[in-house]
Amino acid sequence: MPTKEKVTPQLTNRCFGCGPENPIGLKLRFRNKGNQVETEFTPTELYEGYPGYLHGGIICAILDEAMGWAAYHLSQGILAITARAEVRFKRPALIGEPLLITATLTHKTRRLLRAGATISRRDGTIVAEGTAVMIVDEGN
């Protein structure tokens, strides 16, 4: 049975990862695809490290944002804050190269959420992978 695609809501306009009004932000918009969220991103020179390469810190930010959205969306709206994240860089991401970002919620308890995310090229080559442990926000 096909899964209906849903776009995740904006929680803030100024977020570096997803805020549409942040002039230097990534402006990521995630879609729900069954048991994961996904988005696409094509890096520009604004996010360059070495000439022609996406900065590793931006890769970390993209993975963190994706895992945060997976945690929020796939747990039916629980807000959580990243407590620990691990990133494994596999291949360089090139400026101007379209990237696919996917993330999923892997574990949920009352106080903790765990998520994983992957950044890959269109041909399926994995650029980076990440995992995170997030603490449920006390306001939830």
PLM feature spans:
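Active-site helix/loop of acyl-thioester processing domains in fatty-acid/polyketide metabolism
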Residues: 36, 54-77
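Non-catalytic linker/capping segments at the edges of enzyme domains
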Residues: 1-46
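HotDog/MaoC-like acyl-thioester-processing domains
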Residues: 1-6, 93-95, 104-140
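Beta-strand secondary-structure signal
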Residues: 38-40, 86, 100-102, 114-116, ...
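Hydrophobic beta-strand-centered segment that forms part of the acyl-chain substrate-binding groove
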Residues: 66-100
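Hydrophobic core residues within well-ordered beta-strands of beta-rich domains
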Residues: 26, 35, 81-83, 99, ...
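Hydrophobic residues in beta-strands and at strand termini
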Residues: 41-43, 89, 136
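Short histidine-centered catalytic/ligand-binding loop motif
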Residues: 45-57
